[in-house]
């Protein structure tokens, strides 16, 4: 998967299209990522010791990795490629050529 935790991404599809934010979690097995402030859902929690009345909590839901595009340091969105630099495999932005790792 081309997106990692901590990457700055732009959402390119869905109700939050155009939002630029940071990836909080990545789930490579299911090709999904959790992006800060994107795909907010309301989760109903049962009463417990911490919250005796229960609550409705808002949290980020995972979105498919195909709906995001990685940004480089200059904010240029592009596809991600891989190349070997000094014996290490690194990710780079195919549009700008800038190394992401």
Swiss-Prot record:
Under PROSITE patterns, the record lists:
RIBOSOMAL_L24
Question: Which Gene3D superfamilies does the entry mention?
Answer: 2.30.30.30
Q: Which SMART domains match?
A: KOW
| Annotated GO CC locations | ribonucleoprotein complex; ribosome
Q: Where in this chain does the entry annotate a coiled-coil region?
A: none
The Gene Ontology biological process terms listed for this entry are: translation
Which GO molecular-function terms appear in the entry?
rRNA binding; structural constituent of ribosome
Q: Which family does it belong to?
A: Belongs to the universal ribosomal protein uL24 family.
For this protein, the record's PANTHER family field holds: MITOCHONDRIAL RIBOSOMAL PROTEIN L24
- Give a short account of what the protein does: One of two assembly initiator proteins, it binds directly to the 5'-end of the 23S rRNA, where it nucleates assembly of the 50S subunit.
NCBIfam families reported for this sequence: rplX_bact (TIGR01079)
Put simply, this protein is called Large ribosomal subunit protein uL24
Lineage, broadest ranks: Bacteria, Bacillati, Bacillota, Bacilli, Lactobacillales
